[in-house]
Amino acid sequence: MSQDQKPKVLEVSNLENQDAKWTSLKKIRWQDEKGKIRFWEMAERTTRSEANVDAVAILAIVPIDGSPHVLCQKQFRPPIGKFCIEIPAGLVDSKESCEDAAIRELREETGYVGTVMDSTTVMYNDPGLTNANLKIILADIDMSKPENQNPQQQLDDGEYIENFPIKLSSLQEELFSLEKKGFAIDVRLSTFALGLHAGLKYLSS
C-alpha cells in the first residue's frame, strides 16, 4: 500500500443528526421490568438493508503452502485514531443478500473471488450503545482459479487497505504481537482467534 503521508485525526467536533449520513443519535423512552419509565441514548444506523442486516464481515480462508490462513487487513480507522487489524467487511446494499454482499466486498477490498461456505446468525456489535448489526460470512478462496491469480482491489475514493494473510494455527499469537506494535485489533477477528484457540484447547482432547 503506497501512501504519501501517514493518516491522522485533525479535529473532532459535534455533529447534528441532520448533517449525518450514516448514523444518528436517538433518545429511547422505555419501561423496565418494574414498570418504571427510563431513558437510553443510542447510536442508530440509517442505512439498513431490506435483509434487516447492516453489514457483513468476511472470514476468508486461503491455503498457503498447504496451511489454512485467514485473510486480514490493515486500515486506518479515524474513530480510534490508529490502524486496525481486521477482516474484510462492508455495508449490505438495500436490496442485496448478505451472501452477495460478502462476495462483492471481498472482491472489492481484496481482489479475490471467494465461495460462501457458512454464516453466523445476525450479531449485534454493541447492543448497549447501538442497534448496528452484521453477519460474519465464512468464505473459501480457491487459489487455483484463474480469477485469483492476479487479484486487483477495486477500492472507493479514500479507501486505503492493505491485505495480508495470517496462519490460522498462530492467529492468536500474531494478534497479540500486532497489538504490542501499536495496532488496534478488531473485535470480530479477535473473537474468532480466541474461539479457535479455546476450541483447540478444550475440544481436541
UniProtKB/Swiss-Prot annotation:
Domain (Nudix hydrolase) ranges: 51-189
UniProt KW Nucleus keyword: yes
Annotated EC: 3.6.-.-
CDD domains named among the record's database cross-references: NUDIX_ADPRase_Nudt5 (cd18888)
Motif Nudix box per UniProt: ranges: 90-111
One GO-annotated biological process of the protein: ribonucleoside diphosphate catabolic process
Chief site of localization: cytoplasm
Pfam families documented for this protein: NUDIX (PF00293)
Record-level Gene Ontology MF annotations: ADP-ribose diphosphatase activity
Keywords: Cytoplasm, Hydrolase, Nucleus
Subcellular location(s) of the protein: Cytoplasm; Nucleus
Enzyme class: hydrolase
A cellular-component GO term for this protein: nucleus
Family: Belongs to the Nudix hydrolase family.
Annotated PANTHER family: ADP-SUGAR PYROPHOSPHATASE, UDP/ADP-SUGAR PYROPHOSPHATASE
Name of this chain's protein: Uncharacterized Nudix hydrolase P35G2.12
Protein source organism: Schizosaccharomyces pombe (strain 972 / ATCC 24843) (Fission yeast)
